[in-house]
Amino acid sequence: EHLKEYGWEYIVVDIQWYEPYAATNEYHPFADVVMDEYGRLLPAVNRFPSAANGAGFGPLAEYVHSLGLKFGIHIMRGIPRQAVHQNTKIMNSDRHAREIAKTNSICAWNTDMYGVDPEERRGTGIL
């Protein structure tokens, strides 16, 4: 509640807010992630209780904004590997995760995501 007076402008939730058991700066390789039926990442409710019942980061963002600060989240590019393995449907599309994923496009330090072909319009529903 006193951050703004000390020059803070932004509050950013760092990576792996969608991983229920993240507890340190170490990644859990191939950990289960929280996502909706379309493979879109959701906040882990056990770590962000205000996200319950589909609220997402809305309540937390509103609180941060009420303090006069800006709210953001760290996101990784691509589609969750878990969505590809489950072959989730892509929102507003007749396509599925395996059709848009570039499984050879991976991040060397984080195993959560596969790349998505940016030229492939079928992948826009995951964004």
Locations of regions flagged by a protein language model:
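Aromatic-lined carbohydrate-binding/catalytic grooves of carbohydrate-active enzymes
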Residues: 1-127
